Design a protein with these regions (language model features):
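N-terminal glycine-rich phosphate/adenylate-binding segment common to multiple enzyme folds
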Residues: 89-134
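Residues at the starts of beta-strands that form the adenosine-phosphate
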Residues: 3, 30-36, 90
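Walker A/P-loop phosphate-binding motif and the immediately C-terminal alpha-helix
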Residues: 21-30
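RNase H catalytic domain
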Residues: 45-55
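Anion (oxyanion) recognition and catalysis
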Residues: 29-30, 83-85, 122-123
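Short, hinge-like loop/turn segments at secondary-structure boundaries
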Residues: 53-57, 109-111
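Short, glycine-rich nucleotide/cofactor-binding loops
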Residues: 4-19, 35, 41, 46-47
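A glycine-rich helix N-cap at a beta->alpha junction
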Residues: 55-93
Length: 134
């Protein structure tokens, strides 16, 4: 089975690069391709369960009307999709980055690791896509 590795660096809500990465990961999982993600720097916050949706007072929308997405829900949905499709999904948060940001409360389909995990993921994958910050 083919496996792809993604290295993400952007924090939630900062750049369109993150949502693009989620779309690529979603597409791979739908095609039953295994996915490994190494979250580095601000990207470790993508899986934080403390994120909450909010209303949009500027546009006069309630919480329900705004339907604000939370990245941790996307990460959990990707993990669930992989499980449903019977393909590997390994989301690793850089432990040093987690400690720097206090990003300890995360969705269950993720784990703590180190840059050595990214190295191993890279070697074992058909291809690796690094989505850097600017």
């Amino acid at each position: 089975m083919s496996t792809l590795t993604f290295l993400l660096m952007d924090a939630p809500y900062e750049q369109a690069r993150t949502s693009t990465a989620f779309r690529l990961i979603d597409s791979a999982l739908r095609r039953k391709v295994g996915v490994r993600v190494f979250a580095y720097e601000g990207a470790v916050s993508l899986a934080m369960t403390g994120q909450k949706p909010h209303a949009n007072a500027v546009h006069g929308r309630t919480l329900e009307e705004e339907a604000h997405p939370t990245p941790h829900a996307w990460v959990a949905a990707l993990g669930a999709m992989a499980q449903e499709n019977g393909v590997p999904f390994d989301w690793v948060n850089c432990g040093l980055c987690v400690d720097e940001r206090g990003a300890n409360e995360v969705v269950p389909c993720t784990r703590r690791g180190s840059p050595a995990d990214f190295w191993k993921m890279n070697i074992e994958s058909a291809n690796t896509l690094v989505i850097p910050t600017r």
